[in-house]
Structures are given as C-alpha cells and as structure tokens.
Regions:
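Metal-dependent phosphoesterase signature
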Residues: 57-91
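Short, compositionally biased "basic patch" segments
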Residues: 44-70, 133-139
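Acidic/polar active-site rim loop that often engages polyanionic ligands
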Residues: 18-21, 58, 139-146
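Active-site phosphate-binding/coordination module
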Residues: 17-25, 70, 134, 151
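C-terminal cap/substrate-recognition subdomain and adjoining C-terminal extension
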Residues: 1, 75, 82-225
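Electropositive phosphate-/nucleotide-binding environments in soluble metabolic enzymes
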Residues: 15, 37, 51, 55, ...
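Active-site neighborhood of HAD-like aspartate-dependent phosphohydrolases
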Residues: 1-49
Length: 225
C-alpha cells in the first residue's frame, strides 16, 4: 500500500503540540514558570527560523520528563490532550486522513515532537503508525532525560522513515511513491524525496519553495476552501 505521511504540528494540528506541552508544564507548576516559558519561546522561534539545535532542544524538553514520576506525567498529559490538543485539530484534517484511509494507504505521522506527547494524539486521530523523536526510558518506564536514536527532525526524518520502512517492508510503500503533507521549511528535505509533496498552510519559506517547485498548496484550517 502507498504511504501517506503527515507532519503533525501546524499541519494536522492548528498549533504546535511541543510548544504547547512545555507551556502547559509551566502553567501546572512542573517547571519554573518564567524561565521555562521564555526558553520554550526562544526554541520555538529558532524552529520557525530553521536554525533550531535539535539536540539542545531535546535536553531542554526531556529534562522535565526525568524530574517527575511517570504516573504524574501521564496525568498531566491526559489533561493536556483533553483541554488543549482536541480543540487544536485542524478542521479539515480528519477528512484528509479518512480519504487516504479509504484509498487503502498506510498512514504515518512523522514528527519532531517526542513520542510521549504525540502517541495519544496519533491514537486520537486514528493513525496507526507514528515516527517521533524518542525520549529514553528506563526498564520501569521512567524517563532518563536523554535522547535515544536519531531525532526525527529535518534530514533525520528521512533516516527515521527509512528505518520504519525497513521494519515494515512493502513493495508499494516506498519514499518515492509516498505523499507527504507538511507546513514547515524544516521538512523540505523529506518533501524533496517523496513522489507527492504537499504544502499545508505553509510558512513563508515553504510557500515560496512550493510555488517554485509547482507543489500543491492546501489548507486544513480554511473550512471554506
């Protein structure tokens, strides 16, 4: 079956779950409210500008995971998903996912945001396969605060996707035959590799790149489109 790849933040979601999660942690008192929020905003601006140091960001984002018991993190995450993420789903995203599902495609969310935050979002959207940045866990399920494996960011998305395909071999499920939907300049490396790149509510850099390449540009937020 053909691959249908979807970025998550600002693509299927009308917002950024990673930034929102770190903001949420500050609001519930899990981290220093001012320092953490300011650093979170700085990293987000670097991400938007295409200059984010993903390893530095992972150290920042994974530190709170190691500082609190998993049971408490799970409780916070449930509240976060219910109150902030459900309303963040882009209005036309469920229909797009349904169209690919009905076509028999293999749906994959591929995101730089860590798996702890994004697994319940993928489940909520009914997407079976998630490729995300991984926070290291101990055998008891508690987090160490460290990154494990290749961050699923920029060129790292290509490497992680290749790993996924090696683990899920399918003659039709190749990168060259895949569709990929994204909003971000950071995903241009993978967009260049797939057979059907689609810019979704793109940032200015991706919008210009898509125009130059003749790629489709769509909105999952504009319900009148």
């Amino acid at each position: 079956m053909a691959l249908a790849l979807f970025d998550l933040d600002n693509t299927l979601l009308a917002g950024d779950s990673d930034h929102a999660w770190n903001q949420f942690l500050a609001e519930v008192g899990a981290v220093h409210p001012t320092c953490h929020a300011e650093t979170n905003d700085r990293f987000y601006q670097e991400y938007v500008a295409g200059v984010l140091d993903i390893h530095e960001f992972c150290r920042f984002a994974f530190s709170p995971l190691a500082e609190h018991p998993r049971a408490q993190l799970d409780e916070w995450r449930k509240r976060f998903i219910d109150t902030l993420i459900r309303p963040m789903i882009a209005p036309r995203a469920p229909r797009l996912l349904a169209e690919h599902r009905e076509a028999g495609d293999e749906l994959v969310i591929i995101t730089a945001t860590n798996q702890f935050v994004t697994q319940p979002i993928a489940d909520m959207l009914g997407v079976d396969h998630l490729i995300a940045t991984l926070a290291e866990e101990r055998e008891d399920g508690e987090f160490t605060g460290e990154l494990t494996g290749v961050p699923c960011f920029q060129e790292g998305k290509i490497e992680r996707l290749r790993q996924h395909l090696a683990d899920h071999p399918d003659p039709e499920g190749t990168i060259a035959q895949a569709s990929f939907y994204s909003d971000s300049r950071n995903d241009i490396p993978l967009l260049e590799q797939v057979g059907r790149p689609v810019a979704v509510d793109p940032d200015p850099t991706l919008a210009e790149h898509a125009r130059n390449k003749g790629w489709p540009v769509i909105s999952l937020r504009d319900t009148t489109a």
